[in-house]
Amino acid sequence: MARFVVVALLVLLSVSDLEAIQHPPKIQVYSRYPADNGKPNFLNCYVSGFHPSDIEVDLLKNGKKIEKVEHSDLSFSKDWSFYLLYYTEFTPNEKDEYACRVSHVTFLTPKTVKWDRNM
C-alpha cells in the first residue's frame, strides 16, 4: 500500500510540473503575397512555441476585431510546444492598419503585433 501511495504521489508531482511549464508565443504577422494596394491578399498571424495550449488570437483592422477569420488546428512540435495559423482575406491600401492581438497566460496584457507591409 505504501508503495502505491509513493508512486501515485510521484505521478501527481510529474503532472503538476508539466502544467507549470510556460512558454510565451512567438507572433509573426505577414501577408501571403507581397503587399500591392487594391489587390486581394491573405493576412496571416502565425503563433508558435507556446505552452500551455490555451490562447486567444484576433486579427485586427484599424484596432477592431475582424470577424471572418479562419485558423488551422492546434498542433504541437517535437518539444511539445504548440502552434497555430490564423488567416483572413484582405485588400491592403495606404490608410488601413492591420495587426494580430494575442492573449496568453504568459502575457500580463494582450500583445499586439502590427503587420509590416514591407516584410
From Swiss-Prot:
Gene3D superfamilies reported for this sequence: Immunoglobulins (2.60.40.10)
BP terms from Gene Ontology: antigen processing and presentation of peptide antigen via MHC class I; immune response
Entry superkingdom: Eukaryota
Main localization, broad class: secreted
Alphabetical list of InterPro entries matching this protein: B2Microglobulin, Ig-like_dom, Ig-like_dom_sf, Ig-like_fold, Ig/MHC_CS, Ig_C1-set, MHC/Immunoglobulin
Signal sequence residues: 1-20
Compartments in which it is found: Secreted
GO annotations of cellular component type: extracellular region; MHC class I protein complex
Record's keyword annotation contains Transmembrane helix: no
Occurrences of domain Ig-like C1-type (ranges): 25-114
CDD domains: IgC1_beta2m (cd05770)
Classification via PANTHER family: BETA-2-MICROGLOBULIN, MHC CLASS II-RELATED
Protein name: Beta-2-microglobulin
Organism of provenance: Leontocebus fuscicollis (Brown-mantled tamarin)
Lineage: Eukaryota, Metazoa, Chordata, Craniata, Vertebrata
